[in-house]
C-alpha cells in the first residue's frame, strides 16, 4: 500500500493542521492514469489502512530526513565541570592526566594517580617559586677581564704640607701666635720666647683678645661600677689616656648662651692644635671673599725638577690651588691641560719624577707639626681630596710609587644601588667635577652646615650667595659645627645613605718603596747643582729635599664588570627544565593548562549568571513570550529548527475542529469522488 502525504498549513508551533491521505489498493496503472490525479482532501484525517481516523489521534508526521551539517559556533564551552575535566584529561599532552579518567572503575588507582599528580604539581610549582625568588633577588656575577693597552696617566697633586703666611693675614696670624705662646706658658709653663713675659700685656686675660680662650677643664671622676657576677663582663681594656685631673679645651655656646659644652682633647698637643686650627679658620674666612686671589708661590720654590717620560715638564702641565691646611698645591696632568700624558711603557723611567723642596721657612709651626710634602693620585675629572686619599713624603728619602689601574663597572637599577652621573642623588654637587661618592658626602655636609648654621665651612666649596663661617658674623658657628660633625660621624645626617656609589669607577692601586736620597757620596754635588739651578741655598741638606717617582708597574689593567646571574633566558630555561622533569611537557602543554583554567573560569561565571537570572529576573509577557515559546524546539529537534523565522505569528483563533465530520466509508476507489471528503462549513 502506498501513501502520499499532502502538507497542509501549520500552526505557529510548527505542527500541521491536518492531512488527507488517499488509499490505493489494487488499482491498475491504466486506471489510475485514466482517473487522473486526485484532488486534495482538505481537513480530513489520515487514513490508516482502509479507515479514516480523526485528526490528532494518529502519530504526528515527521519531517523528511535530510543530511545537513550543523554549524559550529565560534566559541563553545562545556556544559559542566565533569565534561570539561573529562575532555582535558583525554586530550592533554601532560603526562599522567589520562590516568585520572581511564581507571574510573578502579577507585584505588584513580585516587593514587590523583594524589601523585597533585604532589608532582605541587613540587613543580615549589621549584617555580624558588626560581622566581632567585630571579627577583637580582643576583650579579663579577666578571674579571685583563686588558693591555696604552694608559692615560692619572692626575697627581702635590702639596707643601704647611700653609704659607700670606700677606693678607700675616698680622692676624702673628697676633694669634703671640696669644698661643702666652697660653702655652700659662698652661704648661713653656716659654717659647725670651720676650714673652716682658710687659703687663702678657699678664692680661686671654678672654679680652679671643672669644674662645684655651683653658684647663677639670675632669669629673667616673663613678665606680658595681661588680657583676656575670662572667661575660670583663674589665675595660682601654684605659684613659690622660690620667690627670684636668684636660685642655675651649668652651663653645649657642647663640643665646643657653647651651654650652667643652671641646677637649686627651692630649695637650692635640688640644692646642685644634684650638689654633679653629681660630685659623676664622681668620681665613674673614679674608677669603675679600681677597681677589691668593698669591701663588712660584713652582720653582717648591719643585726643583719635574720630568715625565724623560722629558721636562712645562707650565701648561700643572695648575695651582690653595688648601687651608696643606698650603700650596700643584696638580699635574689635570683636565685643563691641552693634552693628557700617555704611558706607553711601564717602569720608573717612563713616569713622573719630581724633586721637591721640603724646607719650612716662614711657615706656621703650630698648625702643621710635620715636615715633607703630601701627594695624592686621582682621575683628571675628580677633585684632589688630600685628607682622604693622600699620604706624606718623607724628607731626604726617594719615594717610588708604582700604580695599577682597575676599572669597576656596576649594574644599576634593580641589580645594585649605584648612580650613573649623580643626577638622581638628592644632593647638589658643589664641586666643579664629575660625581663621586666623596664629592657627594662633602657636598651633603656643606648643605647641612648651611642649613643649620647659616654659613659655609671653609674647607668645602660653597654655593653662590653664602658666606664662610667666622665668629665675627656668626658667633655660634663653632658650637653648631662641632655638633654637626658629631652627627655626621654617626651618620645621623643620612649622607652615607643618600650618596650612592657611582656605577663606573676607575681606581689606582698604589704601592710605595723608599730609599735614602741622595746618598752620602752624591749629596754634595746634587745639592750644589740644585742650589745653582734654582738660585736658592739649601740650609739643611738632608731635611730640605725629597724625591718622588710615580709610574705604572705594568700596562695590564683589570676590568671588574658585573652581569646578571639570572637573566630572563636563564629563567625560562630553568622553568622549562622543571616542567619537563615533573610532567615531561612543553610550552604547548602550558598553553593547554592555561586554556583549561580559562574554561573553568568561564563555566563558573556562566553558572553564576544563570543562577542570578533564574532568581532575580523573569521574561516579559505578550508577543515576546509568544516568540520565546515558538522558538523553543521540541526535545527531539535541534535548536536550529525554529518556526518563528519561517512562519508569521498566529493572530486569529484556530479553526473549530469539532465541526469537521468524519469521512463516510469508501465504496470503491475507482468511483470515489473528491467531493465526498470535502469539508463542511461550520
Swiss-Prot record:
InterPro entries assigned: ENaC, ENaC_chordates, ENaC_CS
**Activity control, per UniProt:** Originally identified and characterized by its inhibition by the diuretic drug amiloride.
What GO annotations for molecular function exist for this entry? Answer: ligand-gated sodium channel activity
The question of whether Transmembrane helix is a record keyword is answered with yes
Disordered: annotated segments: 34-69, 221-240
Q: What is its main location?
A: membrane
Function field: This is one of the three pore-forming subunits of the heterotrimeric epithelial sodium channel (ENaC), a critical regulator of sodium balance and fluid homeostasis. ENaC operates in epithelial tissues, where it mediates the electrodiffusion of sodium ions from extracellular fluid through the apical membrane of cells, with water following osmotically. It plays a key role in maintaining sodium homeostasis through electrogenic sodium reabsorption in the kidneys. Additionally, ENaC is essential for airway surface liquid homeostasis, which is crucial for proper mucus clearance.
Q: What is this protein called?
A: Epithelial sodium channel subunit alpha
Q: Could you read off the lineage of the organism from its UniProt record?
A: Eukaryota, Metazoa, Chordata, Craniata, Vertebrata
Amino acid at each position: 500500500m502506498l501513501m502520499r502525504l499532502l502538507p497542509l498549513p501549520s500552526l505557529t508551533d510548527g505542527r500541521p493542521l491536518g492531512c488527507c491521505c488517499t488509499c490505493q489498493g489494487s488499482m491498475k496503472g491504466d486506471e489510475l492514469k485514466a482517473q487522473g490525479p486526485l484532488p486534495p482532501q482538505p481537513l480530513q484525517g489520515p487514513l490508516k489502512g482502509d479507515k479514516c481516523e480523526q485528526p490528532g489521534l494518529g502519530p504526528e508526521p515527521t519531517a523528511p530526513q535530510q543530511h545537513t551539517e550543523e554549524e559550529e559556533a565560534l566559541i563553545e564551552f562545556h556544559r559542566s565541570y565533569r565534561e570539561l575535566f573529562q575532555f582535558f584529561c583525554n586530550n592533554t599532552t601532560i603526562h599522567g592526566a589520562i590516568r585520572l579518567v581511564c581507571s574510573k572503575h578502579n577507585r584505588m588507582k584513580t585516587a593514587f594517580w590523583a594524589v601523585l599528580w597533585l604532589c608532582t604539581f605541587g613540587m613543580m610549582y615549589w621549584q617555580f617559586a624558588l626560581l622566581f625568588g632567585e630571579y627577583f633577588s637580582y643576583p650579579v656575577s663579577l666578571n674579571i677581564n685583563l686588558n693591555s693597552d696604552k694608559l692615560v696617566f692619572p692626575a697627581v697633586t702635590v702639596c707643601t704640607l704647611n700653609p704659607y703666611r700670606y700677606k693678607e693675614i700675616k698680622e692676624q696670624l702673628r697676633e694669634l701666635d703671640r696669644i698661643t705662646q702666652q697660653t702655652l706658658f700659662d698652661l704648661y709653663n713653656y716659654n717659647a720666647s725670651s720676650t714673652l713675659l716682658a710687659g703687663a700685656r702678657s699678664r692680661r686675660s686671654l678672654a679680652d683678645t679671643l672669644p674662645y680662650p684655651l683653658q684647663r677643664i677639670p675632669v669629673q671622676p667616673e663613678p665606680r661600677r658595681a661588680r657583676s657576677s656575670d662572667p661575660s663582663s670583663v674589665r675595660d681594656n682601654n684605659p684613659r689616656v690622660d690620667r690627670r685631673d684636668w684636660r685642655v679645651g675651649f668652651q663653645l655656646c649657642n647663640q643665646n648662651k643657653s647651651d654650652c659644652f667643652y671641646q677637649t682633647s686627651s692630649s695637650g698637643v692635640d688640644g692646642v692644635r685644634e684650638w689654633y686650627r679653629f681660630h685659623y679658620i676664622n681668620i681665613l674666612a674673614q679674608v677669603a671673599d675679600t681677597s681677589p686671589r691668593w698669591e701663588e708661590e712660584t713652582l720653582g720654590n717648591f719643585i726643583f725638577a719635574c720630568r715625565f717620560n724623560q722629558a721636562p715638564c712645562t707650565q701648561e702641565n700643572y695648575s695651582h690651588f690653595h688648601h687651608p691646611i696643606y698650603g700650596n698645591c700643584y696638580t699635574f696632568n689635570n683636565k685643563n691641560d691641552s693634552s693628557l700624558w700617555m704611558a706607553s711603557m711601564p717602569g720608573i723611567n717612563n713616569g713622573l719624577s719630581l724633586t721637591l723642596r721640603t724646607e719650612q721657612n716662614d711657615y706656621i709651626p703650630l698648625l702643621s707639626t710635620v715636615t715633607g710634602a703630601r701627594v695624592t693620585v686621582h682621575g683628571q675629572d675628580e677633585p684632589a681630596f688630600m685628607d682622604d686619599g693622600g699620604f706624606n713624603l718623607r724628607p731626604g728619602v726617594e719615594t717610588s710609587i708604582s700604580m695599577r689601574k682597575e676599572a669597576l663597572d656596576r649594574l644599576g637599577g634593580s641589580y645594585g644601588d649605584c648612580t650613573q652621573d649623580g643626577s638622581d642623588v638628592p644632593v647638589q654637587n658643589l664641586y666643579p667635577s664629575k660625581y663621586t661618592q666623596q664629592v657627594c658626602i662633602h657636598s651633603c655636609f656643606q648643605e647641612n652646615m648651611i642649613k643649620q648654621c647659616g654659613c659655609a665651612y671653609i674647607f668645602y666649596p660653597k654655593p653662590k650667595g653664602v658666606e664662610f663661617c667666622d665668629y665675627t658674623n656668626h658667633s655660634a658657628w663653632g658650637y653648631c659645627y662641632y655638633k654637626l660633625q658629631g652627627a655626621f660621624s654617626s651618620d645621623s645626617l643620612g649622607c652615607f645613605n643618600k650618596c650612592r656609589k657611582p656605577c663606573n669607577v676607575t681606581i689606582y692601586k698604589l704601592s710605595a718603596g723608599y730609599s735614602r736620597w741622595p746618598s752620602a757620596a752624591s749629596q754634595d754635588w746634587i745639592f750644589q747643582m740644585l742650589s745653582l739651578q734654582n738660585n736658592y741655598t739649601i740650609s739643611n741638606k738632608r731635611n730640605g729635599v725629597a724625591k718622588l717617582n710615580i709610574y705604572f708597574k705594568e700596562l695590564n689593567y683589570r676590568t671588574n664588570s658585573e652581569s646578571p646571574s639570572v637573566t630572563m633566558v636563564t629563567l625560562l630555561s630553568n622553568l622549562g627544565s622543571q616542567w619537563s622533569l615533573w610532567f615531561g611537557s612543553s610550552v604547548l602543554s602550558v598553553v593547554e593548562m592555561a586554556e583549561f583554567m580559562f574554561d573553568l573560569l568561564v563555566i563558573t561565571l556562566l553558572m553564576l549568571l544563570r543562577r542570578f537570572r533564574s532568581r532575580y529576573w523573569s521574561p516579559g509577557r505578550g508577543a515576546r513570550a509568544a516568540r520565546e515559546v515558538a522558538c523553543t524546539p521540541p526535545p527531539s529537534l535541534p535548536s536550529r529548527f525554529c518556526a518563528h523565522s519561517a512562519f508569521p505569528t498566529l493572530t486569529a483563533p484556530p479553526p473549530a475542529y469539532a465541526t469537521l465530520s468524519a469521512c463516510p466509508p469508501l465504496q470503491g476507489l475507482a468511483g470515489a469522488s473528491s467531493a465526498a471528503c470535502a469539508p463542511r462549513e461550520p
